[in-house]
């Protein structure tokens, strides 16, 4: 739910539900929600850094900002990428966030604060089962990153655009070539 609309009503419904459970001392969903909300911008930032041929320069620059937003639990850092290519990007992000949330819940991770990204790690006892939480976050981020690699097409570079590319048939048909 956190990756479906990245800050939209579905995302906010999941977040609000988890925050409401904190008052009842139910802390597992908050951990899953925050980790799953961090996964989309982290995955896009990582993918933009690793797979430069699948992102233009503007997207690679936005990927750097997405990493900072991701560690801060600002899911909206993924919106520019999803808005540009929603049918490829959103399913990849949902898959990774689902993996993150599932590992977090299965591992019994609990988060006693409603926001803060990785900065909550500095608060003593704010995260129960921190190692499992980090594994969940890493696993989901890698799932989304790998999925993005598989579904995003390489972007044409400046030397491969149709206007500057010489067709192979032209060079092969010239005498002496």
Listing of model-derived features with the role each one plays in the protein:
Residues 1-162, 167-168, 172-176:
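Pore-lining transmembrane helices
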């Amino acid at each position: 739910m956190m990756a479906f609309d990245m800050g939209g009503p579905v995302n906010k419904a999941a977040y609000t539900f988890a925050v409401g459970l904190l008052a009842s001392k139910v802390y597992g969903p908050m951990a899953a929600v925050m980790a799953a909300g961090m996964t989309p911008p982290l995955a896009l930032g990582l993918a933009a850094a690793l797979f430069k041929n699948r992102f233009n320069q503007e997207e690679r620059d936005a990927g750097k900002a997405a990493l900072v937003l991701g560690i801060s639990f600002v899911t909206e850092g993924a919106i520019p990428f999803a808005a540009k290519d929603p049918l490829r990007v959103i399913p990849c992000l949902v898959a990774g966030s689902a993996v993150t949330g599932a590992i977090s819940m299965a591992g019994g991770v609990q988060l006693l604060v409603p926001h803060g990204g990785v900065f909550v790690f500095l608060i003593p006892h704010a995260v129960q089962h921190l190692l499992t939480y980090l594994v969940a976050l890493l696993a989901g981020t890698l799932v989304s990153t790998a999925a993005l690699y598989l579904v995003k097409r390489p972007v044409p570079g400046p030397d491969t655009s149709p206007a500057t590319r010489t067709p192979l048939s032209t060079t092969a048909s010239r005498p002496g070539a």
